Amino acid sequence: MGAACPRRPIGARILPMVIYCFDPERGRRWTERLTGIRPQFACVLGFTETALIPGISAAGLTPEARRFTALGDGEVLLAGRSARLPSAPEGYPSPVVISRAVVELLGLPVRVFDAGLPETCKDAVHLGGSPARCLSTGRALAPDTVAHLFSQGLAWGERLADEGGYLAIGECVAGGTTTALAVLRALGHAADGLVSSSHPRCNHTQKGALVDLALQKADLPIDASALAILAALGDPAQPAIAGMAIAASHRVPVLLAGGTQMLAVAAVAERLAAEAGLGWRPEQIAVGTTRWVAADPTADAALLAARIGVVPLLAAALDFSHSRHPALQAYERGYVKEGVGAGGLAIAAELAGIDSERLLAAIDDWLDRWNLPTPV
């Protein structure tokens, strides 16, 4: 396992909910600049048929339900309601409950982007992408689609940076930790056994075998471009988020709100920026996840971040042990862990001055309201 994730002070002020997991010096500098500032939040939704493989993901009650996980999360983010709250097979709720609670608590501006869903998300910004085929095909996305999504991400990154503050970017892609593993391996990073998942124990053997098959089918040359890697093995959210992060980071700090999937985005963004001659500002970027990912005994996010070596990894020390909802207490047993920007937004709440007790109360209160009738 990699290095532990110690808690660190920032100057005279201690941020008790922020854990610095990799590159703590850069992480402290990044958070110090943003204390007292609220972000704008962008969440990119996508779908990969990889999610339909039984057992590959727990981001949905059934494999078929995973077609609509991102749709439900997007609806909750935008409206606070959905016809269905996505949940794990055991019934534990999506981490969107954390994200939406922070959005309401801080009054954050939210944009949801549809990079490629099977069904349209109402009120989302449509980027003109498409769902990905299963990565086992070695032809997940059309190269033109990847290039278009990257271009759209760049354009939106510039536009969002114009609005000031800093930008937190989340994602929702069921099966996305597996596409992340595939992209990381194709980029040359030793990521096997390190990625997290929505399962309480990560299904490394299943993921690894699928990625082995995908790499064999893709038959990428050793000098394959980042766009070619994403076309062969990726999902539609990855090029869009990478473009957003690259463009926005030229002007404002960027928080990639997620775990394994956002570490993969950071790695591919570095390569994309170099190949496109766009300039790379890693000092402007941090990845922010949850303690449940950082402390996952069946993965190692800190070691993965160190092997990638691109940006600091932070984690929110959010604790559901004392939640009044047993379904949230299950997060402490390794279920769900992260998604929809949950960890990064919990860090944003801390930076904005919200303590852990107030944040937990807001999340509990939000889930209390979930069963109320939908307003007409």
Curated annotation (Swiss-Prot):
InterPro entries according to UniProt: Nict_dMeBzImd_PRibTrfase (IPR003200), Nict_dMeBzImd_PRibTrfase_arc (IPR002805), Nict_dMeBzImd_PRibTrfase_sf (IPR036087)
CDD domains linked: DMB-PRT_CobT
One Pfam entry name: DBI_PRT
Gene Ontology MF annotations: nicotinate-nucleotide-dimethylbenzimidazole phosphoribosyltransferase activity
Family: Belongs to the UPF0284 family.
Protein name: UPF0284 protein glr4139
Source organism of the structure: Gloeobacter violaceus (strain ATCC 29082 / PCC 7421)
